Each structure stands twice: as C-alpha cells, then as structure tokens.
Curated annotation (Swiss-Prot):
Keywords: Cytoplasm, Lipid biosynthesis, Lipid metabolism, Phospholipid biosynthesis, Phospholipid metabolism, Transferase. Its EC number is 2.3.1.274. It is an enzyme of class 2 (transferase). This is Phosphate acyltransferase. InterPro entries: FA_synthesis (IPR003664), Phospholipid_synth_PlsX-like (IPR012281). Catalyzes the reversible formation of acyl-phosphate (acyl-PO(4)) from acyl-[acyl-carrier-protein] (acyl-ACP). This enzyme utilizes acyl-ACP as fatty acyl donor, but not acyl-CoA.
Amino acid sequence: MKIAIDAMGGDHAPKAVVLGAMKAIKEYSDLHITLVGKEEEIRQCLMSDERITILHTDEKIESTEEPVRAVRRKKQASMVLAAQQVKDGEADACISAGSTGALMAAGLFVVGRMEGIERPALSPTMPTVDGKGFVMLDVGANVDAKPIHLYQYAVMGSVYAEKVRGIENPRVGLLNVGTEDGKGNELSKQVFAMLKDAPINFVGNVESRDLLQGVADVVVCDGFTGNVALKSLEGTALALFSMLKEQLMSSFTSKLAAAVLKPKLMVLKDKMDYSEYGGAALFGLKAPVIKAHGSSNDQSIFSAIRQTREMVAKEVIPTISSVMEKESLQ
C-alpha cells in the first residue's frame, strides 16, 4: 500500500509530517510512504528512510493563496504533486495538512470526482462523551447543497462508518432545528423524505445540542450548517477549557486541586480532541484524500495515516461506488 503525503503542509511541517510518517512505517509493515516537499528539510527530520521515498519540490501552496488559482498555476506544489501521485497510480491515497480549499481543488481537478457524485463532502470524525465519536458531513466543501447531495453524503458516511470505524448498521441522523418529522427548511424536509427510503439506518432528525452525546454515528448536513456547527463545538470546547484553567489557577487551594485532577483532566482533553480520530476525508472522489488538521503534530499525522490506510484496506471507495450504482445514482 502506498500513501503520498504533502510534507510541506501544516503549521509544523515538515517535522511533524516526517515523524508521523516514521511512526506509521514502524506500525504497518505493508505501508510505503512518499513524502512530497523540500528534500533537504525532510532529511533533517528523517532518521530512517525505510519504505519512505522523497519526491523533491521547492514549491508549496500558502494558506493565503486563492485555492483554485493556486492549484491550477502551481503544478509543482507539494500538495498538487501528492494528488498527482494518486492520479498516476503511484499512490493509493494522499494526505495534506495544508490549505483546505486548495486540497479540495486538488482533489477535484487532479484526483477526480467519483462518477455519479455531484459534490464531494468534507467529513471529520467528531468526539463524543463516550469516546466513540461520530462522522459529520459536510462541514464546508459544499455550502449550497441540493437534496441529492445530502442523500449521497448519508450513503457515503454510512459506508465509511461501517467499513473504517467498525460500526455495524451505523445510525444516520439529519442535522436539524428539531427532532420532529417535518421540522426545518425546505431542503431539510426534502432530504428527510429521501433518507427514509435510503438503504441506511436513518434515525431521523438530530439537534446540534445532542451531537456530543452520540445521538448518531453519522450526521448529515449542508456545508454551511456543518461548518457553523463544527466551529461552534470547537469554540465552546476551547472556551470551557480556558475558563476551567483560569479557575483552577486562581488560588493556592485550587492549584492543589488542579494537581490532583490533572490526570483526569488530561483524559478528558484527549477524549474531546478530534484530531486523534484522524483527518477529515473528502468523500466523493476517485481515491481517498484526507485533510489533516492544520496544527497537526506527529501523533495527529499518524492518526491520519492510520485512517487513510483503513480506507484503502477496507475498499471504502469501491464500496461507495457499488452502493451508488445499485441505487441508480450513477
């Protein structure tokens, strides 16, 4: 199995990417990794090149650049070359912690869209209080969705949850303003009717306040709604931890309590860190394309590689294609 990784993408590149890749190579004997980026910088962090190949390029896409234009103009950028490795059959999948917009553009223009899928979806795995997590799609790839798009997202998310996350008959919920049938805008109502007849375990509407309670294994929404929900959850978690830290550091007594509670607080922090679940998959493309978090450390990169490997090994893309074909969506 071969995975191409943009070694220059992310806040801590290339060090975090290289260390994460080496950790994955030690863990999986069937894995070969191509690191795309500045060879000199990569080799400074690389302690062993066993089953690791370096594809040198000096070019990268900056987060400040317009995504589509950058992908079209910078053919030798590390992210674009990683995607090109997939298109040329040199890699089974690719990963980048770089610009989300640029990776979506590279996925569409280089890797290519799966036949029958109108709009790809960006899908991270989010944390829940029980530690199991849930898949949410879309969170920003397609902000102006049609009912057929969300129908396809539900099917793709269900296949992923079953194949990669090992959830038998995963529960699929539609993010809405209420749990009752008939709630929501016209898009939600149309999608609800379609999902009732879909070949999935549709559990109906779910509200954002219940997401962290694990109300569903797959949560479907348009990209605008999903992005707002994602960032609201992120912001709330950061604010709560910040307020908790402030209170625990406010006096000598509370500092003593903090020292006692520290191991438990670290467990809680890790449980709510969605980067540990891997990256956000771009569903609807011809091959797995994974967006790692921009601030990924080596462990987060390793998690993204593990996730990508599972997608390839469990044949998620061919399975999605087969299900779509049966549903006459191709």
